[in-house]
């Protein structure tokens, strides 16, 4: 009877506490933020990587994720994971969360020019068409938890929610779960990141 009680207690405890080492949890979080920073850099390089356009327009969702969601997700899938073991899953999840697309819009615009009548020598104005090229960059962030929900079974999702409620027994890890990156909401490609000191 005592053995059964102990076994049950151990199981519940295991379902509420992160089992990976702090360094691996923070390491995986750092690696995911690195993917986000690389994405931000790619967006900022758009005029350099795609020169020769008259205008660059950006349609950007915020680049951000909740580190608690990522850690609870990885723990649900792998339990006592190491930083190196989850590299493939980090990249796979990142590709599902973010979608970057680009396209070119060509507009026909008109400019006013002054011409000289060859017969009378009198100047006059006319409209001359020209092409105006706009390079569009769009970033969609589906949200990390949307991706997580699609990945997990019902039983796994319940376990994930427990980790979220308990913060895996380690509330000190991310200081309340500040997002990995932020945006000023202006729709410009410049995204300012605030990296926690412990990362």
State the predicted function of each range.
Residues 1-198:
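Membrane-proximal envelope biogenesis segments
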């Amino acid at each position: 009877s005592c053995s059964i009680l102990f076994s049950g207690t151990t199981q519940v405890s295991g379902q509420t506490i992160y089992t990976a080492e702090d360094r691996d949890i923070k390491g995986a979080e750092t690696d995911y933020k690195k993917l986000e920073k690389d994405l931000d850099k790619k967006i900022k390089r758009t005029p350099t990587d795609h020169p020769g356009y008259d205008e660059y327009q950006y349609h950007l969702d915020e680049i951000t994720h909740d580190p608690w969601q990522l850690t609870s997700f990885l723990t649900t899938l792998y339990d006592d994971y190491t930083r190196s073991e989850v590299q493939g899953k980090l990249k796979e999840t990142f590709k599902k969360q973010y979608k970057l697309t680009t396209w070119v819009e060509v507009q026909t615009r008109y400019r006013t020019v002054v011409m000289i009548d060859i017969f009378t020598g009198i100047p006059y104005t006319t409209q001359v068409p020209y092409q105006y090229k706009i390079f569009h960059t769009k970033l969609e962030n589906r949200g990390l938890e949307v991706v997580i929900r699609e990945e997990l079974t019902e039983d796994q999702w319940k376990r994930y929610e427990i980790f979220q409620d308990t913060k895996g027994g380690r509330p000190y890890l991310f200081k309340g779960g500040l997002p990995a990156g932020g945006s000023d909401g202006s729709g410009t490609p410049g995204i300012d990141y605030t990296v926690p000191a412990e990362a």
